[in-house]
């Protein structure tokens, strides 16, 4: 239980709690990211307790030097944390310090000057086009209820057909894609940023079939995708069903819902999509994030989206 105690003085505890709420409500970070930042900063406060000789408060945070942060990263590295985990931890600490700085409580310049650990380059692991088609087809779904099979197919088709994150797909409203003529979708992604993505006819048909079979009233202002009891659809349900599909289709463990988004980008690039367009479709803030897909598939066949996508 000691791991979950927050070793900080009341002023810092309250400020940290306000920061975490801000990340979820205003920055609209995913619950998984907020949870990771909570865990990383909790570990940082545990480190400072030993480093400072007692529970730290805002005054202790204000007096932090880059050497203190380097000491924390070194301790985490010695405990077995990899570069990616260390980088995320530093990002969380920087975010907290910037939050405190905006309130006039600390100076975050020291943390900003600290270089993040070098991240290893790892290539995304997309599905093959044929495997992706099997995964998103309603015939391939394993759910016994027809409307749930149609729902799962519609969600997975949006991940592969439009490159959505699972949180973006499950955040769609009932009014979104209400007609098969709605070929463009406005998506709100990370950090509240919006982008326009094209929607393939196969995705529109999948959504229309889900609407037809869904036993619940889909209020235009409510969520489009519903759980078995009519509430919001939990991402874990899609991930669980994807795991069942993975087993049934004999796919690798890397075949996850997010791998469909990787497949979207990789297959477009391999069939002629340009990096700038794919960057915009994925909602990447930096082109360097998108450039990782150039190492996955270099075959170039067609030039435009409709003819590029295997589901077009």
Curated annotation (Swiss-Prot):
Record's function text: Site-specific tyrosine recombinase, which acts by catalyzing the cutting and rejoining of the recombining DNA molecules. The XerC-XerD complex is essential to convert dimers of the bacterial chromosome into monomers to permit their segregation at cell division. It also contributes to the segregational stability of plasmids.
Record protein name field: Tyrosine recombinase XerC
Listed GO CC annotations: cytoplasm
Compartments in which it is found: Cytoplasm
Keywords assigned by UniProt, alphabetized: Cell cycle, Cell division, Chromosome partition, Cytoplasm, DNA integration, DNA recombination, DNA-binding
Chief localization: cytoplasm
Record domain Tyr recombinase: where: 122-306
Any Pfam family hit: Phage_int_SAM_1
Annotated catalytic residues: 165, 190, 258, 261, 284, 293
A GO term for molecular function: tyrosine-based site-specific recombinase activity
Species per Swiss-Prot/TrEMBL record: Mesorhizobium japonicum (strain LMG 29417 / CECT 9101 / MAFF 303099) (Mesorhizobium loti (strain MAFF 303099))
Subunit structure, as described in the record: Forms a cyclic heterotetrameric complex composed of two molecules of XerC and two molecules of XerD.
Residues annotated as domain Core-binding (CB): 10-101
Family per record: Belongs to the 'phage' integrase family. XerC subfamily.
GO biological process, one term: cell division
Keyword Zinc-finger tagged: no
